[in-house]
Amino acid sequence: MGIRIYKAYTPGTRNRSVSDYKNISCLKPEKSLTSGKMSKKGRNNQGIITSRHRGGGHKRLYRKIDFRRKKIGIYGIVKTIEYDPNRNSHICLVNYEDGEKRYILYPRGIKIGDTILSSMDASIFVGNTLPLTQIPLGTAIHNIELQPGKGGQLVRAAGTVAQVVAKEGKWTSIRLPSGEVRLIYQKCLATIGQVGNPEFNNQSIGKAGSKRWQGKRPKVRGTAMNPVDHPHGGGEGRTSIGRKRPLTPWGYPTIGKKTRSKNKYSNIFVIRKRKLNS
């Protein structure tokens, strides 16, 4: 896939670029694998804002994605490659030999008509799913389970890829896209290859309306508010925040403040911490 760059026909198309969607083969999703999706607009059951800057956006249908890949030993054929408005990666519709249809994440390089398999002895081919015990060192993987049978939880965003770097006993060392090296139980499943649509980060929205289509509302800077509304607010004209460090609207330190718990149970599985600012 490539990037389509608009000419400056209007102020909104100046500096605007989007994916060219050349590998998208189907416009309408499989009806049996979709369901309605109601936007909460950042509100809880009482109507109180619990997540700011959310609301509006285009209506969406939720596509049910098979992150578990539990069709063990049954071959599937890739029928379509589709756009999914609920994630930045694309998805594939797979028809299995037993007649069942399922959506999976689109692995980069897979084509319509390719055959995929989830099995203990599947070949190391893009789109196949195997336990970490069967995956050789240095292999690129995505959609990695943290607990056997729970479904892939790691490395699912567009263009992301992890790598198997070591094996010892019941554990496999995985280098994640953030640079973190983490131990994962060897019976967990992972899919071979890189997640598709790697050019996603190269797109330029070009206008504010593009964000509104996504259901994202404007973010007002704290320094532009009054002191009653934000710790950074107030002052005559354009001034500094007037604090030793940046704070959230509720007065907690932010931007550089570590938020991971020092006593989190999974800290023992982290061999090397992620890179700074990743």
Swiss-Prot record:
UniProt-annotated location(s): Plastid, Chloroplast
InterPro entries: NA-bd_OB-fold, Rib_uL2_dom2, Ribosomal_uL2, Ribosomal_uL2_bac/org-type, Ribosomal_uL2_C, Ribosomal_uL2_CS, Ribosomal_uL2_dom3, Ribosomal_uL2_RNA-bd_dom
Keywords for the protein's UniProt record, in alphabetical order: Chloroplast, Plastid, Ribonucleoprotein, Ribosomal protein
A GO biological-process term: mitochondrial translation
Molecular functions (GO terms): rRNA binding; structural constituent of ribosome; transferase activity
SUPFAM superfamilies linked: Nucleic acid-binding proteins (SSF50249), Translation proteins SH3-like domain (SSF50104)
Gene3D superfamilies: 2.30.30.30, Nucleic acid-binding proteins, Ribosomal protein L2, domain 3
Name of this chain's protein: Large ribosomal subunit protein uL2c
Organism: Chara vulgaris (Common stonewort)
